[in-house]
Amino acid sequence: RTDDIVDSPLAAMLGPERMEEDLRLWKERLDRIWVQEPTDALDMALSDAKKNYPSMDIEPYNDMIDGMLMDTPGHQLFQDRYETWDELYTYCYRVAGTVGLMVLPVLGTSTTHTLEEAIPPGLSLGIAFQITNILRDVGEDALRGRIYLPREDMSKFGVTEEQIIKGVLDDNYKNLMKFEIQRARDYYVEAEAGIPMLAPEA
């Protein structure tokens, strides 16, 4: 529901101030959910999950909203360019890595592993998914004024912002894509190690 606030056609019509206000209200709703005061039926489902799985933490949910704010023009967290992989990692963690932290308490772990052990692979899966999304949507994002590919990587392979915006797919761009695809694959490998850590019924 929060993703639609910043990435739906309606969001573009309503503008960044409305996006920011809606996300602020979502943080308030989360606070109420965590003290068992849900606003509607969907909130009630999350509130019930929190009651049944007490190890659920509110922090990943708030972090995800911060990730949405990174896509909200005018907000102090907003970024439409990323200088380094470390900067982009923060974005990937917030919008996707957090999902692993949200679902792990519900999925549970095997008797031979702890939740803490399963967290790194869970995070890696979210990071891998988000890198994949970024690589899939390079052209679409560029049309919306966003370039998520780290500038340090683009510079390393001789790829310019103008080239990204114009959709020039030369050898430099292809080599950049190979580099980023390998990064995603490395995270998928790290994530795969977490599968045996999950509870069998998961």
Regions found by a protein language model. Give the residues of each.
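Acidic catalytic motifs of isoprenoid enzymes
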Residues: 1-196
